[in-house]
């Protein structure tokens, strides 16, 4: 279909700028350009893919992190707070400024290659469910909408928590 493409937004879409655009094999290239220009005009950051990638890039990276995070929790190697602090005060701060590949350029690609060759651990292999997630869900801790997940949200309503998140994201975007 020449007038068909995928536009995939991220949550919350009224704050997060990334929009994945993926054309079908028969999509008119002019349509892809029109949509890219449209998203730029409304302040979004469209990322155009030559073809559909199952899960898109950001979701695939997030899924890989999720596997590692749940492995750390399942094995009792780290707490939710330690993991989130490692992300917020290290990984995410650098990635927000440079992304992943530019950060690698700053580290040095030779060092990156040596790190890959001499890795002291193996990334987790998807094996189904996480025992940590199973326990949380069985105890009614499904995340913000249920009042608790990895963290306890102290009786705050979901709308209060989403508002706090949104204000924080807007503050980060404005700096």
Residue ranges and their predicted role:
Residues 17-18, 65-69, 111-118:
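A general alpha-helix detector
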Residues 61-77:
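Flexible helical/loop "lid" subdomain adjacent to adenine-nucleotide binding pockets
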Residues 33, 40-51, 75, 80-175:
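NAD(P)-dependent Rossmann-like dehydrogenase/reductase catalytic/cofactor-binding core
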Residues 1-51, 55-59:
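Rossmann-fold dinucleotide-binding core
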Residues 59-61, 156-157:
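Short secondary-structure transition/capping segments
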């Amino acid at each position: 279909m020449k007038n068909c493409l995928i536009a995939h937004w991220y949550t919350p879409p009224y704050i997060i700028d990334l929009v994945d655009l993926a054309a079908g094999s028969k999509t008119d290239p002019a349509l892809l350009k029109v949509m890219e220009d449209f998203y730029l005009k409304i302040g979004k950051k469209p990322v155009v893919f030559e073809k559909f990638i199952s899960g898109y890039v950001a979701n695939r990276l997030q899924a890989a992190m999720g596997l590692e995070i749940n492995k750390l929790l399942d094995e009792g190697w780290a707490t939710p707070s330690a993991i989130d602090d490692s992300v917020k005060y290290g990984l995410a701060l650098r990635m927000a400024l440079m992304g992943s590949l530019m950060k690698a350029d700053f580290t040095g690609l030779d060092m990156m290659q040596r790190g890959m060759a001499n890795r002291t651990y193996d990334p987790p292999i998807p094996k189904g469910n996480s025992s940590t997630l199973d326990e949380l869900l069985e105890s009614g801790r499904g995340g913000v909408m249920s009042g608790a997940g990895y963290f306890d949200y102290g009786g705050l309503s979901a709308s209060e928590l989403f508002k706090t998140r949104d204000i924080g994201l807007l503050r980060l975007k404005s700096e």
